[in-house]
Amino acid sequence: MNFTLKIWRQKDAKAKGGFETYKVENISADTSFLEMLDILNNNLIHEGKEPVAFDHDCREGICGMCSLHIDGHAHGPSQAVTTCQIYMRKFKDGATITIEPWRSAAFPVIKDLVVNRSSYDQILQAGGFISVRTNSVPDGNAIPIPKADADESMDAAACVGCGACAATCKNGSAMLFVAARVSSLAKLTQGRVE
């Protein structure tokens, strides 16, 4: 498969950025989106050009670091998956693909496709602890939780903190992220004040 890539390039946070066009050829349909960017970067390095900076960590869909706007959609053409879980078979051979960083004041661009995610880190660091001794794990059957409540809690806990909600929200609000974090716990009976 062959693709034309329109990629946002920006030297640093203060520089004015813009789109640059690249071609990648002979890409397998089973290549992940990030692997395709790796191939592009290998080609650029071989040509003596600067590679495209992009963020990633686990490449398994659990960390949310690979956050990109692909053709105007957060994480690309699929629903409920991160960029690293997108495979090139989702795109038509010969397609032009536009790749941008998150567009939100909460995530200022550092370089190319890399954004500063510290705003979400601050939210996570602001809470998430209790002041009592927890001792050992309580008996799982001591406080029965209805399956519907447990299912809703698990759905909310599926949030990996990637920032897609804030990046696609016209207000750039991180409240969807905070709501997912809080909702995952709010549905579960705690049994004590805290």
Model-derived features: positions:
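Flexible glycine-/small-residue-rich
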Residues: 7, 70-72, 101
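Local cysteine-cluster metal-coordination motifs and their immediate loop/turn environment
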Residues: 51-89, 154-175
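A surface-exposed, charged beta-strand/loop segment in the N-terminal or early-internal portion
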Residues: 79-105
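Residues at beta-strand starts and edge strands
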Residues: 1-3, 64, 95
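Ferredoxin-type iron-sulfur electron-transfer modules in oxidoreductases and energy-metabolism complexes
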Residues: 31-50, 95-194
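Eukaryote-biased recognition of intrinsically disordered, low-complexity regulatory segments
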Residues: 1-23
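Short, solvent-exposed loop/turn segments that connect beta-strands within catalytic domains
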Residues: 13-16, 74-78, 92-93
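Short, contiguous acidic and Ser/Thr-rich linear segments
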Residues: 20-32
